[in-house]
Amino acid sequence: MEERLQKYLAECGVASRRKCEEIILEGKVSVNGKVVTELGTKIIPGKDKIELNGKEIVSEKKVYILLNKPVGYVTTVSDEKERQTVMELLNGVKEKVVPVGRLDMFTSGLLLLSNDGEFIYKVTHPKHETTKTYIVKTRGVPTEKDLEKLRVGVKIEDYTTSPAKVELLLKDNTNDISRIWIQIHEGRNRQVRKMCEAIGLSVIALKREGVGELTCEGVERGKWRYLTEEEVKNIMNA
């Protein structure tokens, strides 16, 4: 059955569909030995030979992994500074997976990894509004007015964050510490940290508690598990 080239590349885990479109337009993809730059191009998986930068792209089994990331690991496939990467925690995973979004080195909690470009796009693109839930421990105690700013949206650098759900879990005025529950559907670089800084708080610890309905329940820190078919469907159909 015919399939659009960019969709096939995304399904093979090359990148998100949007990024695959860019790769095609850049002339990096060939079909049966001929460079293709037209996005409407259709191919027949298993029959047509698809190459990216001269290397054949072969569809592999789609896998979806939930990792309980510890602090101290960078969210990347490889690191030029030779720091520990989350890939080192995936013992037994043979497929070539990539992180779905990013948690900085000092953030712990739920991180998804996959080789399914469509799944990655669904989770990471803001238009799909897949929720990401965090628990933040901060130096400084926010006022209700501060919390409302986070709920409405705060200006960070050159953009204003989308509305967020925010609840104060702990207020310790004596030690000047608080714990805040934050749920967003964006995923910009260090967004939650910057949101807290925007209202005068300093982040002591940050943990991602969930993505959509997924949590790290039953998964020890530094360990991982495969998502079930139902969990994948719930994400894709949300």
PLM feature spans:
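Basic, flexible Lys/Arg- and Gly-enriched helix-loop patches that mediate nucleic-acid binding at interfaces
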Residues: M1-A238
